[in-house]
Amino acid sequence: MLEKLKKLLSKKGDNFSTPAPVSVDDYLEEIEEIPLTPVEEEKVIIKVCSIEDEKDAVNAIVMAEAGYIVIAKTPNLEKEIDDEFIEIIRKMRNEVAKFGGMLLALGDEHLLITPRNVVIEKLIKEKKEESNVTKENIEIKEEKEENSE
């Protein structure tokens, strides 16, 4: 059985060889020391609140500036928003930009406010169908150019 495994795993009949013996001291030098107490990761705290007026907006900004990620429920940003609330959001955006944070809309009823040490990146996925169509168009153009020469 072991011989069959050796033949399956070997390249063109190469034989397995056992590694050279290693002294205990050399082996122990290679082992990394494991800490006795596990290192705890810093917990990320997300504050959840509701913004209905300017006072609530100021509280949310203060929490974000203090280093918390804030998710704030708002009136429906498409249906129930008025000029006063638009001005509150504009002020929030300016204040958050001053300390280097970000203000993002999450759907129609939530805002995300982040401190300066949080980075949000949007993933851009290319659809396979589009990429295949593009490749086919390039191949067709190359064939036409070759045929015309």
From Swiss-Prot:
Q: Which InterPro entries match?
A: Cell_div_SepF/SepF-rel, SepF-like_sf
Listed Basic and acidic residues bias regions: 130-144
- Pfam families in the record: SepF
Region of interest called Disordered, as start-end residue ranges on this chain:
130-149
| Name this polypeptide is given | Uncharacterized protein MJ0919
**Organism the protein comes from:** Methanocaldococcus jannaschii (strain ATCC 43067 / DSM 2661 / JAL-1 / JCM 10045 / NBRC 100440)
Q: What does the record give as the organism's lineage?
A: Archaea, Methanobacteriati, Methanobacteriota, Methanomada group, Methanococci
